[in-house]
Amino acid sequence: MSLCFRSNTGDVGPAFYESQGYGWMRGFFGGLVTSCGMIFTGHPEIDQEEENEELGLHGRLSFIPAKNVATECSWEGEDYVVRVRGKMREAVVFGTNLELTREISTVLGEKCLRIHDQIENLSVDPSPLMFVYHSNPGFPLLNLGTRLVINSQQSTEWLEDREVGPEEYQLAQSPQEQAHDDVYIHRPIADKEGNVQVALVNDELKLGIYWEFPIREMPIITQWQ
């Protein structure tokens, strides 16, 4: 059973990336997690501090080919662990030089994927850093009545910048014609270990998915629907 959203663009290769404006949307095929960044995320804008450079939607990262890709499968005690590693670099001559080293791992028999990222600035100059883990749950997990479970100290509606309660954002609605984006900004509460847990639960299917991450690295959750 698929847990993620897949868009109508299909899989799009890096060579077809459109960096300007909302061109990113022409290659956003969905998937369980899409990484956005690394020097910019968000709506397109002009960076007046960098010679009016045009910054396209969500940055370049998701279209940068990975290198040094490797797999490893081995026993670690009683666990059979599968790992996939690779590197991605966002760089320009006389400018940005950021390298992402990623490892995705799982243990045979577990229903869990772990993503470990390390970002290194290989330039002699400081660099901006913006990063989004764009999670894309889809049908049938995401359906009418699917619940978002989140412990938030504050939740606001993005466009109107007004505080909202769970009754407004917690339950998924049915598809609507000519619907606009609904975006909510959550400031989650971490547990004693400093980790945040967020879940999406379909009670009818008895199916769910959850995310766990350190709040010191990801202090804000954006809910887009």
Language-model features and meaning:
Residues 1-108, 112-114, 126, 137-177, ...:
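Surface-exposed acidic/polar loop and edge beta-strand patches at domain peripheries
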Residues 118-123:
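Asparagine-centered strand-capping/turn motif at beta-strand->loop junctions
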Residues 125-132:
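Short, hydrophobic/aromatic beta-strand segments
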